[in-house]
């Protein structure tokens, strides 16, 4: 099974991806997480350090693929999760999406794709150009990380459009949204009323999750010394269980940009006032 995780930049995709990878490993699956971001920090919370990237390794080998071995590019992370970072060109030069394609090419030549039960692509921000949309060519499911805000849902809608486009030629489905760092879901619900898609989980704003990123640890690793964090791990286990159950998923019908802008803007400009106690009693008496 191959998964691709997308979402607005800074929404918490990498932290979410690492914890989902460990949750899948906890369920007995052999997991490979591939970071598809030039920052090459996707797997930091799994390994505790910035691992060498595939592009760096290829440069050292003068792009002789036959000289690269799995141990040159695959590093072991917490919970037995294997980790790869695609890396990217120098800032302001080259195409990061091209590097993602080269990463997939190398891993295929190493037969790495056949070694794992689950491969999870953690993909750069909300960029859905051809290169960074490449993981969708291989994925069975896409998951979109969002929050209860305008910008993240706008980005989610653009990603949904990419899923729909790729699904024309690939057996790809959108597994659903993952709400992150939000205790509310009213704007998410307004969006999925217009663009029907599942919501896999809603994670509230939890300071320990933010701290885990700085520490270079997953919530599962932190919970080993602090059992009070186990309920937080359950959020990720719930997502893993849904994915392993093989959800039907959807081919989303994204909203047009102007239509979505109006829909989400209306939420802020014309908020629905909660009914007063007296109004609720009147309704009950009718």
From Swiss-Prot:
Q: Which InterPro entries match?
A: NifH/chlL_CS, NifH/frxC, P-loop_NTPase, Protochlorophyllide_ATP-bd
What's this chain's function? Answer: Component of the dark-operative protochlorophyllide reductase (DPOR) that uses Mg-ATP and reduced ferredoxin to reduce ring D of protochlorophyllide (Pchlide) to form chlorophyllide a (Chlide). This reaction is light-independent. The L component serves as a unique electron donor to the NB-component of the complex, and binds Mg-ATP.
Cofactor note as given: Binds 1 [4Fe-4S] cluster per dimer.
Annotated Mg(2+) binding sites: 14
- Fetch the PANTHER family from UniProt: LIGHT-INDEPENDENT PROTOCHLOROPHYLLIDE REDUCTASE IRON-SULFUR ATP-BINDING PROTEIN
Q: Which gene encodes it?
A: chlL
Cofactors needed by this protein, per the record, are:
[4Fe-4S] cluster
Query: Does this UniProt record's set of keywords contain Metal-binding?
Result: yes
Task: Identify which top EC class this enzyme belongs to.
Answer: oxidoreductase
Query: Any idea which positions bind [4Fe-4S] cluster?
Result: 95, 129
Taxonomy, superkingdom:
Bacteria
- Subunit annotation: Homodimer. Protochlorophyllide reductase is composed of three subunits; ChlL, ChlN and ChlB.
Biological process, per Gene Ontology: light-independent chlorophyll biosynthetic process; photosynthesis, dark reaction
Q: Which CDD domains match?
A: Bchl-like
Pathway entry: Porphyrin-containing compound metabolism; chlorophyll biosynthesis (light-independent)
Which Gene Ontology MF annotations are present? 4 iron, 4 sulfur cluster binding; ATP binding; metal ion binding; oxidoreductase activity, acting on iron-sulfur proteins as donors; oxidoreductase activity, acting on the CH-CH group of donors, iron-sulfur protein as acceptor
Keywords, in A-Z order: 4Fe-4S, ATP-binding, Chlorophyll biosynthesis, Iron, Iron-sulfur, Magnesium, Metal-binding, Nucleotide-binding, Oxidoreductase, Photosynthesis
| Protein name stated in the entry | Light-independent protochlorophyllide reductase iron-sulfur ATP-binding protein
Protein family: Belongs to the NifH/BchL/ChlL family.
**Catalytic reaction list:** chlorophyllide a + oxidized 2[4Fe-4S]-[ferredoxin] + 2 ADP + 2 phosphate = protochlorophyllide a + reduced 2[4Fe-4S]-[ferredoxin] + 2 ATP + 2 H2O
Per the record's keyword annotation, is Oxidoreductase included, yes or no?
Answer: yes
What are the binding positions for ATP in this chain?
10-15, 39, 180-181
Q: What EC number(s) does its UniProt record assign?
A: 1.3.7.7
What does the record list as coiled-coil region(s)? none
Name any one Pfam family assigned in the record.
Fer4_NifH
